[in-house]
Amino acid sequence: IGTTYFLIIFLIINNSFGQKKLIKSIQLLDSKNNNERIIFSSDEKITVVFDELNNKSRSFYYEIEHFNFNWELSKIRKSEYLDGFDNIRITNYYKSYNTLQPYIHYQFQIQNKNLQLKKSGNYKVTVTDREGRHVFSRKFIIIKNSLNGTIEISKMKDINYQNSHQKLKVNIPCNNCNFNSNTFQYKLIVFKNYNLNDFRLINRPTFKLSNSFVYDNINFTGGVEYLNFDNSNILSTNIE
């Protein structure tokens, strides 16, 4: 089982516990392949699905908020990142049939005829009921694939961490970026296995080459799959 690392560069710019227990199977899916994801390209449609353990449908609404690189609510106006309007009622739902537990399945799309996201960055979708009470929220990221960075994964040099950590070296192409600026404009965020809670935020690169930035010594903890196995002394292997 391998580990996936995802790079993102940012240009700096009521109590409802009772009903939450009834909400199950919340997922953000890419609308093309129905794969659960948290990171989407700017031209992809996102399908949000969830179930409520109930035999009667209710009115739910959703809204979208934009956040900065540090997941703090953006100071930009909604019209700057959203074309259209949100706080839209979810009208696509159906009832379960012949199930031991009755439920209502709801779904809606982000990037639809009423709502288009105009900016890349961090977002949160929030679903509320008719009274405006919070039902659930999910974070996701919209990206524009304008850079092709590379990642090198290697063992830690410190022997105390070789069996528990791994080191990453990231190279980001950037021909026209100013490394010597007092206020460096870019930040690198590396996510492990698409987990928004397991990431590294790097404010400045370690050094700059002629046409790229290099971020060195980015460390992550790893599981047993990263233990080194030396087979250099194995002379032959019999496979039956």
Regions found by a protein language model. Give the residues of each.
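Internal, hydrophobic beta-strand segments that form the core of beta-sheet-rich folds
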Residues: E65, K118-E131, K187-N193
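Aromatic sugar-binding surface patches on proteins
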Residues: R89-I90, Y97-Q111, K208-S236
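Ligand-binding face of N-terminal immunoglobulin V-set domains in extracellular IgSF glycoproteins
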Residues: L100-T128
